[in-house]
Design a protein with these regions (language model features):
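Hydrophobic alpha-helical transmembrane signal-anchor segments
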Residues: 1-18
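Small/polar-residue-rich segments within soluble enzyme cores
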Residues: 10, 51-54, 60-61, 65, ...
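Short, basic/aromatic recognition patches
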Residues: 18-33, 207-222, 267
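Second-shell loop/turn segments in exported
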Residues: 26-30, 57-69, 76-80, 98-106, ...
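Short extracytoplasmic
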Residues: 26-54
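Short, small/polar residue-rich loop motifs at catalytic or cofactor-binding pockets
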Residues: 32-36, 222-226, 297, 413
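Beta-lactam-recognizing serine transpeptidase/beta-lactamase-like catalytic domain environment
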Residues: 176-190, 194, 229-274, 279-514, ...
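Conserved, well-ordered alpha-helix/loop/beta-strand core segments that scaffold catalytic motifs
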Residues: 183-227
Length: 557
């Protein structure tokens, strides 16, 4: 518009000289609309919210205006008081000569942001923002994960499902006058922001609470360095609880140590000790190296093999294979695995999933250690079968035992039940997936019977028993490896099993790192297994198995 024409139009419309200046400075601007991240829900009937976005405000400053109006110190003092910040921190954000933009503080709640607005400070404004919020703080922290400062998932489901959870920002392209007032009738583009998809987990908040409470009791009672538990549906691979200690507050993840951030259920590798015997003996039975009633000489507690002495915790003479499982004889198991041979032992452990990631839909899973047979020493076959010289994660060990419960079929564990878009479309649905067969259904049936004897009188896992239900499982007490040998004071205690033994529904593993002073799996981990199993069976209303005449099986207590 020419200068003369513009002045004539201004006079005709009655526009003042100041307003004429604002009109003259009309310009086009773009503004991003912040997207909302999807929510995370548990898998219970109540669909409890585990993570969501809250609407908050960021405090934005134009330092040049504050300096020009000599209000820098006043703004610093008032904002620091309202926001509960150190004055030096606020001053550091505001005292920037020549700058037109500075973010003073983030994530202001309604009351605080209104108080900032009421200050009426020139050069201070509020900008809409969102904050990721976790209603239950540390509860289920290792599974949920957190959103880092860049707005990207930093661990757990937040990281693994980030592509689904994150939304898409919108865009408003419009025109503003010299006072930065938008001329709405001149809007060029208006693309709304798209909310991210919601994630529904297989985890049940109620069972998770049972697991976490049991872990806290274990940590306190045994002064452990760490403890973790997983509960899995044996037929499907659904994870209904996964907890790890120590834990951290998701709303204050920056204060957490690396030890607290670690999800030990999938990210901590340890030598399993005697829980591995369930797999190696299953392999021997499947290859018909022996039968359940085959008798082996357990050498009264000391066996010289390949120049090395292998000992039992208690000395035994002649034991059947069934009693080798029940008594957890190192020597009896080692004799079976030596007869089986290194190649076959390695093949079966691989079939069970040892040495490979399970493929669970969570980041941070370790694959454990199962060396190729060519790297085995002359005693490896006798030691790996009893859980030495091989390392696993708790999820690997549990998933392998669940295969025995599931007629020999290995399932892929999963934790995401469903992904639903903001407009209600199901984008992904978790489903049971068979990985392969580890042993025959006949061998699996025999192993279930043998493992159920572990919790009967005279077995190593009597403290894992559950009233009115049969329990199958295996204890583990493993010395921690140090400097090419094994510690005489640091142990990993565990119990892994499934219930009911007669008609398996749930697999559970409890692992405790460096309990003191007692350190055996049967004393430290088995009671926690019993507590979780008892409460979970009741919660899921899993019926007490009945024998053929219709009567209930008698209590194991």
């Amino acid at each position: 518009m020419g200068g003369l024409a513009y002045r004539l139009l201004s006079l005709h419309l009655g526009i003042s000289a100041t307003d004429r200046d604002h009109v003259a400075r009309i310009r086009r601007v773009e503004r991003l609309l912040r997207e909302r991240r999807g929510r995370i829900y548990d898998g219970s009937r109540d669909a409890n919210i585990l993570a969501l976005d809250l609407e908050v405000k960021d405090v934005i400053a134009d330092p040049s205006i504050l300096l020009a109006n000599n209000e820098l110190e006043l703004a610093t003092e008032q904002i620091a008081e309202v926001a509960g910040l150190d004055e030096a921190e606020v001053m550091g954000a505001l005292d920037r000569p020549g700058r037109r933009y500075a973010r003073v503080c983030r994530n202001m709640q309604d009351e605080q942001s209104e108080a900032i607005r009421d200050l009426g400070l020139r050069g201070i404004s509020l900008r809409d923002a969102t904050k990721r919020y976790y209603p239950h703080n540390s509860f289920m922290c290792h599974v949920i994960g957190f959103l880092n400062g860049e707005g990207v998932g930093g661990s757990g489901v937040e990281q693994g499902m980030n592509g689904f959870l994150r939304g898409c920002p919108g865009l408003v392209e419009s025109v503003v006058d010299g006072r930065r007032r938008e001329l709405y009738d001149r809007r060029v583009q208006d693309i709304p922001a798209k909310t991210g998809a919601d994630i529904c987990l297989t985890l049940d908040q109620n069972v998770q609470y049972m697991a976490e409470r049991a872990l806290d009791e274990v940590m306190e009672r045994h002064g452990a360095k760490g403890a973790w538990v997983i509960v899995e549906r044996v037929r499907t691979g659904e994870i209904v609880a996964m907890a790890s200690r120590p834990s951290y507050d998701l709303n204050d993840f920056g204060a957490a140590s690396q030890e607290e951030l670690l999800n030990r259920a999938i990210g901590f590798v340890y030598e399993p000790g005697s829980t591995m015997k369930a797999l190696s003996i299953a392999a021997a039975l499947n290859e018909r190296i022996a039968e359940r009633d085959t008798i082996l000489n357990c050498e009264d507690g000391a066996w010289l093999h390949q120049g090395k002495v292998l000992r039992d915790y208690h000395p035994y003479g002649r034991l059947t294979v069934a009693d080798i499982v029940k008594k957890s004889s190192n020597i009896g198991t080692a004799k079976l695995t030596v007869s089986l041979g290194a190649q076959k032992l390695s093949e079966y452990l691989t079939r069970f999933g040892i040495g490979s990631k399970t493929g669970i839909d969570l980041p941070g899973e370790e694959q454990g250690i199962l060396h190729p047979v060519r790297r085995w020493s002359r005693i490896s076959c006798s030691r790996i079968g009893i859980g030495q010289g091989v390392s696993v994660t708790a999820l690997q060990m549990l998933n392998a035992l669940c295969a025995i419960a599931n007629d020999g079929v290995v399932m892929r564990p999963y934790i995401v039940s469903r992904v639903v878009s903001s407009d209600g479309v199901v984008l992904h649905e978790g489903r049971p997936k068979e990985v392969g067969r580890a042993i025959s259904s006949q061998t699996a049936s025999i192993m279930r019977q043998l493992l159920s004897r572990v919790t009967e009188a005279g077995g190593t896992g009597t403290r894992a028993r559950v009233r009115n239900y049969s329990v199958a499982g295996k204890t583990g007490t493993a010395q921690k490896p140090i400097d090419g040998g094994y510690s005489s004071s640091a142990y990993v205690a565990s119990f892994v099993g499934f219930v009911p033994a007669d008609a398996p529904e749930l697999g559970i593993i409890v692992v405790v790192d460096e309990p003191q002073p007692l350190h055996t799996g049967g004393v430290v981990a088995a009671p926690a297994f019993s507590t979780i199993a008892s409460e979970a069976l009741s919660y899921f209303d899993i019926p007490v198995p009945r024998i053929h005449d219709g009567t209930e099986i008698a209590s194991t207590h």
